[in-house]
Curated annotation (Swiss-Prot):
Gene name linked to the record: psbC
Propeptide stretches in the record: 1-2
Protein name according to UniProt: Photosystem II CP43 reaction center protein
Subunit structure: PSII is composed of 1 copy each of membrane proteins PsbA, PsbB, PsbC, PsbD, PsbE, PsbF, PsbH, PsbI, PsbJ, PsbK, PsbL, PsbM, PsbT, PsbX, PsbY, PsbZ, Psb30/Ycf12, at least 3 peripheral proteins of the oxygen-evolving complex and a large number of cofactors. It forms dimeric complexes.
Subcellular localization, as worded in the UniProt entry: Plastid, Chloroplast thylakoid membrane
UniProt cross-references to HAMAP family, sorted A to Z: PSII_PsbC_CP43
Role: One of the components of the core complex of photosystem II (PSII). It binds chlorophyll and helps catalyze the primary light-induced photochemical processes of PSII. PSII is a light-driven water:plastoquinone oxidoreductase, using light energy to abstract electrons from H(2)O, generating O(2) and a proton gradient subsequently used for ATP formation.
Keyword terms, alphabetized: Acetylation, Chlorophyll, Chloroplast, Chromophore, Manganese, Membrane, Metal-binding, Phosphoprotein, Photosynthesis, Photosystem II, Plastid, Thylakoid, Transmembrane, Transmembrane helix
Residues engaged in binding [CaMn4O5] cluster: 355
One Pfam family here: PSII
Superkingdom, natural source: Eukaryota
Length: 461
């Protein structure tokens, strides 16, 4: 009887002897079988889209309109809401039907992809080169690889333009900076200036500079997508029409495993960027849907207690705290009026609920005394009690109530998951890059399976 460990197991007509890989190496057995590898990739896409559709419908089924999205552990509906679907002024959900439609469309798409995956895995030709030369390829064919890269870039460019079209012509996006607490807004005047758009890329990633994570208006977001979408389409056409230059042919390793390593490195970078975006940014990740950022929760607590104590008669401009610094207000290193207390570390925070109270020199005392609106008080109190924290100390002064409701912010989920997965993908990038470079140099054929201990063990039965 065959077991999973005796090396003779044949899955889909491919065994360890003929492919050089054991059954558990998965798609490595299909490296030179373009048709079967297509099936694996299409089936994988089907699984991804199925998860998106099923999870989408799961969130719709459990959604409670009276509660904020971030209090319900949702991660997909906030993305749809950010795109302007189903929400109105203040980020209030007015219609869940678009969310239902999104889930159903993804499920239907996953069925098509699933069928295609099964077909190409089990029925379709093992290799595409003979029957469908356009879709066929050989990993070492540098010109074909360049063409495939170009096709991918064109598709990605159209993806970026889809957001632009949604923002400008198909209903707009949710803009948390709209007056009165955010609203869906058509972006009519996106930022085209290369100085502004590429200025983000040249900024420091640290502190208040924040690289591209510091984007704080929808015009720049849409303008950035116009630029990157256009560049990707033009770059894709370039790669389709041209052949790699001599320096590129020499510089890169041209093998399936090398391309895998490049892809893993790119996905890793995107995961780390997504981690920082979801944790720090409250423009493209509106706090109305994802909950406050860490600095936002801390600042909102200082604001909430300033409002309370001012009503009780405190002079918030001159009251001293236990350290001798201002209890409610103090000055930043650059002389601006900022909130006092531990939240001073977040003095450069910017948020839609707070900005109306600023003047030319930081927070405006006159506005703090006379112009605070009820919606600002409500939002700050809500954000204060929903900090994205998993820590008992060093939380920027936010009260950590051990008997509070068990709340985990979607920002915590998204940032932590993308950081961990980004790290794993980076390790995978290093692993496969090392193997690919070694194979290209001719001194590495992978781990020697002939001396695998399990091969000398007797069958389990």
């Amino acid at each position: 009887m065959e077991t999973l460990f005796n090396g003779t197991l044949s899955v889909g007509g491919r065994d360890q002897e003929s492919t050089g890989f054991a059954w558990w190496s998965g798609n490595a057995r299909l490296i030179n079988l373009s048709g079967k590898l297509l099936g694996a990739h299409v089936a994988h896409a089907g699984l991804i889209v199925f998860w998106a559709g099923a999870m989408n419908l799961f969130e719709v089924a459990h959604f409670i309109p009276e509660k904020p999205m971030y209090e319900q552990g949702l991660i997909l509906l906030p993305h749809l809401a950010s795109l302007g679907y189903g929400v109105g002024p203040g980020g209030e959900v007015v219609d869940t039907f678009p969310y239902f439609v999104s889930g159903v469309l993804h499920l239907i798409s996953s069925a098509v992809l699933g069928f295609g995956g099964v077909y190409h895995s089990l029925i379709g030709p093992e290799t595409l080169e003979e029957s469908f030369p356009f879709f066929g390829y050989v990993w070492k064919d540098k010109n074909k690889m360049s063409t495939i890269l170009g096709i991918h870039l064109v598709i990605l460019g159209f993806g970026a333009w889809l957001l632009v079209w949604k923002a400008m012509y198909f209903g707009g996006l949710f803009d948390p900076w709209s007056v009165g607490g955010g609203d869906v807004r058509v972006i009519t005047n996106p930022t085209i200036s290369p100085g502004i758009i590429f200025g983000y890329l040249l900024k420091s990633p640290f502190g208040g500079d924040g690289w591209i994570v510091s984007v704080d208006n929808m015009e720049d977001v849409v303008g950035g997508h116009i630029w990157i979408g256009t560049l990707e389409i033009l770059g894709g056409i370039w790669h389709i029409l041209t052949k790699p230059w001599a320096w590129a042919r020499r510089a890169f390793v041209w093998s399936g495993e090398a391309y895998l390593s490049y892809s893993l490195g790119a996905v890793s970078l995107m995961a780390f960027i997504a981690c920082c975006m979801s944790w720090f940014n409250n423009t493209v990740y509106p706090s109305e849907f994802y909950g406050p950022t860490g600095p936002e929760a801390s600042q909102s607590q200082a604001f909430t207690f300033l409002v309370r104590d001012q009503r009780l008669g405190a002079n918030v401009a001159s009251a001293q705290g236990p350290t001798g610094l201002g209890k409610y207000l103090m000055r930043s290193p650059t002389g601006e009026i900022i909130f006092g207390g531990e939240t001073m570390r977040f003095w450069d925070f910017r948020g839609p609920w707070l900005e109306p109270l600023r003047g030319p020199n930081g927070l405006d005392l006159n506005k703090l005394k006379n112009d605070i609106q009820p919606w600002q008080e409500r939002r700050a109190a809500e954000y204060m009690t929903h900090a994205p924290l998993g820590s008992l100390n060093s939380v920027g002064g936010v009260a950590t109530e051990i008997n509070a409701t068990n709340f985990v912010s979607p920002r915590s989920w998204l940032a932590c998951s993308h950081f961990v997965l980004g790290f794993f993908f980076f390790v995978g990038h290093l692993w496969h890059a090392g193997r690919a470079r070694a194979a290209a140099a001719g001194f590495e054929k992978g781990i020697d399976r002939d001396n695998e201990p399990v091969l000398s063990m007797k069958p389990l039965d």
